């Protein structure tokens, strides 16, 4: 199956979300792109997260990483982020892409694959 064929199956592309401390955002984003685990990461520098942790309500400024990647690469992406992340239990979740511009979906699949083959 070619990348173009895969682009027609939008489920082959996922968006992953990961929050992190602002000073770590660019490092984590670059890591997953350089490792060929993602085609692109948007860094939203400041989001407010309100959550319960160890019985207490926390209110923190974080950065949000919006990661475009192949669905197949998500397990490795998740594990890489978990290992490199400063939090004990980082948010790393995957959302399936239901639809998108076919040329963009094809690019996501190709760019991530290109990154992995360049490192080989």
Language-model features, listed with the residues they occupy:
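Positively charged, small/polar-rich N-terminal and surface patches that mediate targeting and assembly
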Residues: 1-120
């Amino acid at each position: 199956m070619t990348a173009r064929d895969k682009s027609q199956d939008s489920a082959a592309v996922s968006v992953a979300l990961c929050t992190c401390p602002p000073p770590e955002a660019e490092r984590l984003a670059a890591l997953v792109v350089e490792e060929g685990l993602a085609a692109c990461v948007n860094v939203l520098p400041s989001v407010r997260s309100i959550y319960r942790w160890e019985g207490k309500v926390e209110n923190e400024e974080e950065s949000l990483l919006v990661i475009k990647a192949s669905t197949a690469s998500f397990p490795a992406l998740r594990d890489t982020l978990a290992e490199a992340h400063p939090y004990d239990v980082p948010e790393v979740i995957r959302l399936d892409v239901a639809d998108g511009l076919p040329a963009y979906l094809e690019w996501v699949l190709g760019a991530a694959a290109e990154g992995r083959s360049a490192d080989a």
